Amino acid sequence: MSATINLEKKHFPVLLDEIIKIISPRYSGTFLDCTFGQGGYSEKILENPNNKIIAFDRDINAIRLSELFKKKFEERFKFYHKKFSEIKDLETKNFKAIIFDLGYSTNQIFDEKKGLSFNFKGKLNMKMGLNSFSAHDVINKLEKEELIKIFKFFGEERDARKISQLIIKKRSQCFLSTEDLVDIINKTKKNYNFKINKSTKSFQALRIFVNQEISELVFGLINAYKLIPINSYIVVVTFHSLEDKIVKFFCKNYSENKKNSRYLPETKHTCKFFELVNKKIITPSPDEIKRNPPSRSAKLRCIKKIKEGANFDEFILKFKNLLEIENIGKKLC
């Protein structure tokens, strides 16, 4: 078999060199790749014959590639077709590093069956795998106020109310398709000039809601902390402001010594559980952005675990509103 595993499209793992420098896979160990995707991080780590990878991915298309990895790397590679919030069920506890790449690959974006892009026609989908409902269900079944919350908080869409009102009005005539939703958004924003496509924020909101990305990330990070031993790393690459806000709070809040104040609610932790590996976020170099334009919005954060016993009630409470909005999806299951 060739030294590299062929992929359908040229794949560039984002910030690969920077991640490899941090986690030092030249020294033997076991690593957890929570978003296997097209295998870029895993393959690089497995270049060291003493390294092992356990990989997770919810996308059914990742299974085929994982079989190629199993043939090439044999017992050094193990794959689970699961969401990364389920890493808590792993028996292995000695990971050197746990890696989360929260972006979407080119293959996923241009997969018409997934319906992630507003450039395709047909039925709304946006399911990444192991989902209970689709974007079609969301747009055609939820109430106006529920849609407003999704667009406003998950897409940071300032026209959430107008868009939701038009959705309710138009769906009374027929089930709405991707083209219908794009048309509604364009009509709502016809007098605006945008650097990004007018549909970007609304489609982001639906994708986050359909795939329950907030709860996946919140509990994925908590479970990652519980899995790794002292002096091991959690590495996260984010691509939009909402997920980066969650990761930033997780990293910074638990890497500071805190004192209770009579003016503020009592905190559950007063000592550091993490050490910030990079004090400032790491972003792609101009060369990487030129080679791989979608990487331009990537932000890398890394922490090292230095203490057991963290209580994450404060973390969950911080994003309670977003988690409650996600729970609206239960009525579609």
Predicted regions and their residues:
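S-adenosyl-L-methionine-dependent methyltransferase catalytic core, i.e., the SAM/SAH-binding region
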Residues: 1-333
